[in-house]
Amino acid sequence: MTSSLVIYIFLWSRLICQIFPCERPGQPFAYHILGEAKKKKNRKRENRTCSIGNTCTQTYTYTPYAKKARQQEKLWERRNERTYGANSQQTFEHT
């Protein structure tokens, strides 16, 4: 019973990873739903694999435009850490 449950959870997590892929390694797959989808068109997918659970393990090859967008994203992340604290759940939405 336990082994069949583990297999079921593993297969279900694989299905979820295919439906809701992550944008960056280490990000929860829900992050993709919350706003990363619009940035996806600027990135070239190299590999799409997921680990068990909600954490992504894939890698991306970035286009020059996406590299610039990622630099801007890092800037916003630093601003969020200064404004709300590194461990805060509150984030600043930017467009």
Curated annotation (Swiss-Prot):
Residues 1-17 form the signal peptide. Keywords: Signal. Partially overlaps YFR035C. This is Putative uncharacterized protein YFR034W-A. The lineage of its organism: Eukaryota, Fungi, Dikarya, Ascomycota, Saccharomycotina.
